[in-house]
């Protein structure tokens, strides 16, 4: 299916990763209902989840963490502070409330 929506957020202050993740989680829940974060990227530290997902991607257009999430049903990307942080989500769908 692939990503069907991208939301851009600006988070004020210097709350770092925790503040960005909290804001992204809220935006994702408002858009998808019950959902889970399948992947993330932190530009400042170069940290991504799943770890090392982009290492084998070289010059590919799509980062490894994004491809990982999309291939597992993710449909929403939340970009915080102009790409300082990226979080990718999927709805729990039939698993919601279980």
Predicted regions and their residues:
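Contiguous hydrophobic, core-forming segments of folded domains
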Residues: 1-2
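Generic structural motif
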Residues: 12-14, 72, 83
